[in-house]
Amino acid sequence: MKLLVYAVHDSISVSFGTPLFCFLEGYARRALIDGYADRPGNPGDFVLYELGTYETDDASFHLHKLPSRVCSLAELVEG
């Protein structure tokens, strides 16, 4: 089974959070809202990136050369 790998980038601390392993992009978007909406600061500081995929059959990662931007928290809660 293939899982998508996502992580939230915090532009204030200039770091990525713990990776999220999801079946669909919608789960990652929901995790972004649930995990970061109550944090102080600008919602635009938290951006969701797709990092690649994880194959559960052979436990292998296939990561993108560069993370692919999905959306920011501001786009989800304000738009």
Task: List each model region and its residues.
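Intrinsic-disorder/low-complexity peptide segments enriched for small residues
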Residues: M1, C22, C71-A74
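Generic structural motif
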Residues: S11, E25, T53-Y54
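Short, mixed-charge low-complexity intrinsically disordered segments
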Residues: Y36-G79
